[in-house]
Amino acid sequence: MLKPVRIALDAMGGDVGPQAIIPGAARALQRLGDVRFRFYGDRAQVEPLLRQHPALADVSSVHHTDVTVRMDDKPSQALRAGRRVSSMWQAIEAVKTGEADVVLSAGNTGALMAMAKVCLRMLPGIDRPAIAGIWPTLRGRSIVLDIGATIGADAPHLVDLAIMGAAMARIVLKVERPRIGLLNVGVEEIKGLEEVKTASRLLRQLTLPSLVYHGFVEGDDIGRGTVDVVVTEGFTGNIALKTAEGTAKQIAQYIREEMGRSFWSKIGYLLARRAFDALKQKLDPRQINGGVFLGLDGIVIKSHGGSDTIGTANAIEISYAMARYEILSKIRESLDLTREARAALLVEGTGSLERMAAPHRARQDELGENKVVGADQSMTAKATGT
């Protein structure tokens, strides 16, 4: 019999904190069953809500904290004020100590990444983290990474993203050998930044039993579902994500305006209501809520800061899947199989994407936005969901 998945929840994270986290967990429990929850936050706020859901209370424990990381805190501020004492830190630490299998927070993304890097550290051989998101497509769903953890990437890092993204796709998409595409300005091999072209050559050279390299893909291929995993660096990935979210809202607004324009349009809406409801479901970002932090030596999931009960429940289901199907073991296995080949790739050096990102990171370090207290590491604070 499988052991229940233990999920540590930052109960104070997000725009409404426990008002969304607790009922979201109750909703997820109805679907999952074999799960246990550890809530970290203000006991006075968490326990009254928990009592409204007896089934959830039976499989949960509450761990009081006095400090909450604010949504507008800089990562350096969050670490100074919240290290070891905040709900976010203690939820992450539960994974490190083995008390939980996965941590979920709807809090400040930059702070969550900074704390996770300090507390959990990176996987051996991985220098920089990534955020992977689930993307609705015409063929179902795909994985896109990086969607905002790190700005700029060299070719070996893009290869690492492909390996980690493939591991996630095997769990989420149930595909044994996911098709991988590198996001580029064209599909021709001569197009794009040198670093992306180098990464493409490296992926073709590697013999990876865990994935199939498709080649370059363009922006419109993401929604088409041309590949299972789209790999890019965090700057372009985050722009693609925000553009898609904005386009979905724009389409929904157009439909609402047209449906209310005349009597006949209202009649048309009523006749096609089932189809419109299905479209609304596909465009609803709550259905794919939950960004996975890859590259860390522990499983960390980021829920959108504005998530409601439905969005939270879906993020918990992603958390459950990543832990139940052992995403870390799959990533470690893939990295071990390619360790020597990936080490040889380092001689390729860095290229234009890395040079493009260097001034940005230097400026952020100067402002103190990316300095990690107590460790000689830095990170990119800007990411999704903050």
UniProtKB/Swiss-Prot annotation:
The record's section on InterPro entries has: FA_synthesis, Phospholipid_synth_PlsX-like
Q: Major place of localization?
A: cytoplasm
Question: Can you state the subunit structure given in the record?
Answer: Homodimer. Probably interacts with PlsY.
EC no. given is: 2.3.1.274
**What is the protein's given name?**
Phosphate acyltransferase
Homology family: Belongs to the PlsX family.
Q: Where in the cell is it found?
A: Cytoplasm
Q: Where is the composition biased (Polar residues)?
A: 377-386
Pathway note: Lipid metabolism; phospholipid metabolism
Keywords attached to this entry: Cytoplasm, Lipid biosynthesis, Lipid metabolism, Phospholipid biosynthesis, Phospholipid metabolism, Transferase
Tell me the enzyme class: transferase
**What reaction is this protein's catalytic activity?**
a fatty acyl-[ACP] + phosphate = an acyl phosphate + holo-[ACP]
User: A GO term (biological process) for this protein?
Assistant: phospholipid biosynthetic process
Q: Where is this region: Disordered?
A: 359-386
One Pfam entry name: FA_synthesis
**Lineage from the top down?**
Bacteria, Pseudomonadati, Pseudomonadota, Alphaproteobacteria, Hyphomicrobiales
Function, as annotated:
Catalyzes the reversible formation of acyl-phosphate (acyl-PO(4)) from acyl-[acyl-carrier-protein] (acyl-ACP). This enzyme utilizes acyl-ACP as fatty acyl donor, but not acyl-CoA.
State any GO CC term: cytoplasm
